[in-house]
Design a protein with these regions (language model features):
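Well-ordered beta-strand positions
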Residues: 27, 33, 130, 173-174
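ATP-dependent small-molecule kinase phosphotransfer cores
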Residues: 36-110
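ATP-dependent NMP and nucleoside kinases share a basic, alpha-helical "lid"
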Residues: 97-106, 111-147
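Small-molecule kinase domains that catalyze NTP-dependent phosphoryl transfer to phosphate-bearing small molecules
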Residues: 99, 108, 126-127, 147-199
Length: 199
C-alpha cells in the first residue's frame, strides 16, 4: 500500500488533483466529503451539535428528531471562534481517521490519494508515505472561493485558519502549481503519478 496526502490552501485545487490521480488508478478519499456525508450524519455527532448549539445548527423533523446539520450555520459559528472550531475538530477528526483506517484495511494493496486540508496544521504527516501540496497565488484562491459563493471576507477568514501556503510548500514532498491551463496541471499530475508509482 502507498498513501499520498494531498493538501494545499482552500480553493487551491486539491480535489482536482486527487480526481486526476484517481483517473490514473489511485483510490481517492475526500476528507471533506467524509465529514459532510458521514460524520455530520452520525446521530451521535448531531446530538452533540444540538446540545451545544440548539436548533440553530441542527435541523429537526416534525417530531423534533435531528435529521441534518445546517452546514452554513455551523461554519459561521466555528470559523469565527477558534475555541468552537477546535471543539468541532475534536469530534469530527477521530471519525475521519476511522474512515481512513477502514478504507485502507479494505484495500491494503491500493495506492491512495487522500485529500487532507489540515494535514500539516494537525500534524498528520505520519499517516502518509508522501505529502503533496497543491498551490496557487492568494488572488486565485480568493477568486475561486468567491465563485463558490463565499464573500471575500469569509474567504479571507477561511484562508487565515490554515498555515501559510509557503509553509505548506516547504513541508511537502511534492508541489503542484495550479494556476495555468488544465493541461499544465495534468502534465504535473502525470509526473507526480509516475514518481509515486516508482517510489
Amino acid at each position: 500500500m502507498m498513501t499520498a496526502g494531498i493538501t494545499g490552501g482552500v480553493g487551491s485545487g486539491k480535489s482536482t488533483v486527487a480526481r486526476a490521480l484517481e483517473a490514473r488508478g489511485f483510490r481517492r478519499l475526500d476528507s471533506d466529503w467524509i465529514v459532510r456525508e458521514q460524520v455530520l450524519a452520525d446521530p451521535a455527532v448531531m446530538a452533540a451539535l444540538r446540545a451545544r448549539y440548539g436548533d440553530a445548527v441542527v435541523k429537526t423533523d416534525t417530531a423534533g428528531e435531528p435529521v441534518a446539520v445546517d452546514r452554513p450555520a455551523l461554519a459561521e459559528r466555528v470559523f469565527s471562534d477558534d475555541a468552537e472550531r477546535l471543539w468541532l475538530e475534536d469530534i469530527t477528526h477521530p471519525r475521519v481517521f476511522a474512515a481512513w483506517r477502514a478504507a485502507f484495511a479494505a484495500e491494503p494493496g491500493a495506492r491512495w490519494a487522500v485529500e487532507v486540508p489540515l494535514l500539516f496544521e494537525k500534524a498528520l504527516e505520519n499517516w502518509f508515505d508522501f505529502t503533496v501540496c497543491v498551490a496557487c497565488a492568494p488572488a486565485k484562491q480568493l477568486a475561486r472561493l468567491e465563485q463558490r459563493g463565499l464573500s471575500r471576507a469569509l474567504a479571507r477568514q477561511r484562508i487565515s485558519k490554515q498555515l501559510p501556503l509557503t509553509r505548506k510548500i516547504d513541508l511537502s514532498d511534492f508541489v503542484l502549481w495550479n494556476e495555468g491551463s488544465p493541461a499544465f496541471l495534468e502534465a504535473q499530475v502525470d509526473r507526480l503519478a509516475d514518481a509515486l508509482v516508482a517510489a
